[in-house]
Amino acid sequence: MTTLTAQQIACVYAWLAQLFSRELDDEQLTQIASAQMAEWFSLLKSEPPLTAAVNELENCVATLTVRDDARLELAADFCGLFLMTDKQAALPYASAYKQDEQEIKRLLVEAGMETSGNFNEPADHLAIYLELLSHLHFSLGEGTVPARRIDSLRQKTLTALWQWLPEFVARCHQYDSFGFYAALSQLLLVLVEGDHQNR
């Protein structure tokens, strides 16, 4: 990633964490189709590796605005993809892909963080990885902790996430018939890949 700042990347990770952590409510649905969001998407598309993924997401958002009962339909998609059994789903947990579910706990401890009691999901949930990456990118921009230490932890987190993210994304594409969460996961995959290469 060359044109996006550390804070902008942090915001993308935080936004994706929110969208993968719970179903969209009416306010989020309105916001995702807003002019402000269109400006944000335009900024993201200025980063060439993200362009195709953002275009795909924008197409889904445009289709979403004319979908009957969009919020209820997206809630059903969310539930079917992320809350059911793994037979025809894309469970958002490292352990669902035979990865060490304790790794994220070690990374959180190293970052001086812990999971919130308000988030009733296991610590190896995708949203926790994304919140940690968001925190680390914000920390890079603040300059209060040595950049080398933050960058080392960022690379460890990206490596741990990359162990299972491609399979998660493939499952989103396979089982999300409408495509909104598949498009979100594709944007995440490209973002993580670019972030991982930006050492």
UniProtKB/Swiss-Prot annotation:
Question: Can you name this protein?
Answer: Chaperone protein TorD
Q: Which Pfam families match?
A: Nitrate_red_del
Described function? Involved in the biogenesis of TorA. Acts on TorA before the insertion of the molybdenum cofactor and, as a result, probably favors a conformation of the apoenzyme that is competent for acquiring the cofactor.
Q: Which UniProt keywords are given for this protein, alphabetically ordered?
A: Chaperone, Cytoplasm
TM helices/strands, residue ranges: none
Entries under HAMAP family matching the protein:
TorD
Its annotated compartments are: Cytoplasm
What is any one of the record's Gene Ontology cellular component terms? cytoplasm
Family according to the record: Belongs to the TorD/DmsD family. TorD subfamily.
Check the record and name the InterPro entries matching this protein: Chaperone_TorD, DMSO/NO3_reduct_chaperone, HscB_C_sf, TorD-like_sf, TorD/DmsD_chaperones
The UniProt entry's GO biological process terms, in alphabetical order, are:
protein complex oligomerization; protein folding
